[in-house]
């Protein structure tokens, strides 16, 4: 896994430095990696929406491992009739 990490890091370095070596500016290369419609407001909306969606599905004390969560106890479902 550590080797794969360094391979990705080296590929990113080549991907960023190759256009710079051809006379491009580093800031232009970095801005080229960012989508045109991505703004700080959209980033905050995405982060806020995902945080609230997670809390609606799972209570705060629930522990999930690798995105696998145990089933909710019956007392958490108020609409379930026994």
Swiss-Prot record:
Signal sequence, renumbered to the chain: 1-22
Compartment(s) where it occurs, according to its Swiss-Prot or TrEMBL record: Secreted
Keywords attached to this entry: D-amino acid, Disulfide bond, G-protein coupled receptor impairing toxin, Hydroxylation, Secreted, Signal, Toxin
Disulfide bonds: 64-69
Residues bearing PTM 4-hydroxyproline: 70-71, 73
Protein family: Belongs to the conotoxin C superfamily. Consomatin family.
Protein name: Consomatin Ar1
Organism the protein comes from: Conus arenatus
